Structure formats: structure tokens, C-alpha cells
């Protein structure tokens, strides 16, 4: 029995619904087209059961908008019912191309604006959905994952806030520090997808003269935070690894951080056979 046949023995949680926010509209449409084609081509013995009603549709996208008032404030609106749905909300908090008018001035949307729009749509759902999953490719405030002085832990607060609003699962990609899921250890599911395979695949497909050997290629981490990923890639490909680290001046603080004192320093770590 194939995996697809075996998985269909499990009843759907609810009718599938995709809500791509304005920041993730294009990606949401691609996902929708893939799901429509995939489900249309699948055949299984339970497709006529009542539990699978609405399994095949022309589109799974549910229209939702976040219009703004002249003051710059906004509200979330869903154009159709989502009662009993298995909803997937998609948001790209790093999409700076979107703008809105504030007191006659044009403002670009910041990650804070996108996150607030996400919460507005969750609030508009009003707890009527069967399950809510948030897909956020770049985890909101993921760089603020630890406290090194008197500062806020924004990423942990955001995760706790989403769970408190009824979010069941949070899916992100290559989180800055996956240990931030300690903020919600017992509530909700937190998944961070590592893109190492897609990274290697993309390089191999787009660089025709690539030579993956220690004489022509090495893996370099741009800072200390990326060493884990660099170690994994260099180990898999059998390449040498290098890294840069910042030599900071800890006697001064400029714009809230210690400035780089001299320059970036490079280290090379050869592979062992």
C-alpha cells in the first residue's frame, strides 16, 4: 500500500481552507493550484463519503482582507464562512513592498504591521475554525530569541500570543534559533523546516560549471550563528569549512549594540578524513 493510500484512511480534520494574506498572495496562489491539481488527480475509495465532502474544489483560497482607516489603523475581514474549516494562514513578514496611507503619507509595511494583520485575521475567524495553522516562512522576531541585557523577548511573546489566540500549529523555515519553541512547549505544534536539501539542489541546477570537491569549493558561514548549517553542509558534501566572526568593541555601545572594532576575521576549518 502506498503512502497516499494509507494516509487517506485518516478522516480530514475539516474542509481545507487557505488564507494567504496580502504579503503572501502570490505564494498562496501557487500552493492552491498545486493542491487543486493534486487532489483532482487522486482516486480513492472514500471520495464519496460525507467526511470527504468538499475534498475536491476549484480553489481552496478563502478571501480575507485587512483594510485600513485614514488614521492608519486596520481591521481584519473574512469574506466567507470558515466554520469547521482546517485553515492555513500564510504571511510573509519581510515583504516590504506593500504600502498604506497614514495621515496623507505613504508608509511601507514593516514586520510589525504584517504580524498585526495576521492577528486581525485570526480574530476575525472568531474561534469557529476546526484547526488553525500559521505558515510564516520567516519567523517573526526570530532574531530576538534571547536576552543579553535588559531587553524584550519578542519572538517568545509572539509565539505565546498566537497560541493564546487559538493557533494549533506554526510552520516556519530555517528558524534563527529553533529553541525558541521552548516558549510554547505544551501548546501548539512548532515546526521549522531546514532547507539544506533545497539549497544544494538549487545550486546544482543553476550553476552548470560547479565542481563539488575540496579543491574547488568550500562552505563559509558569514557569522557565528550560521556555523551549524555550514558544518552540516560541509560534512554532507565533504568540503572544507570556513567562517567569519565579528571582532566587536565591547567598551562602547552604538545604536544599541557593540560596534565592530576592527573587521571581520576569517577562520578555515579543514575536513578530517
Q: What are the language-model segments listed below?
A:
Residues 1-267, 273:
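PRPP-associated nucleotide enzymes
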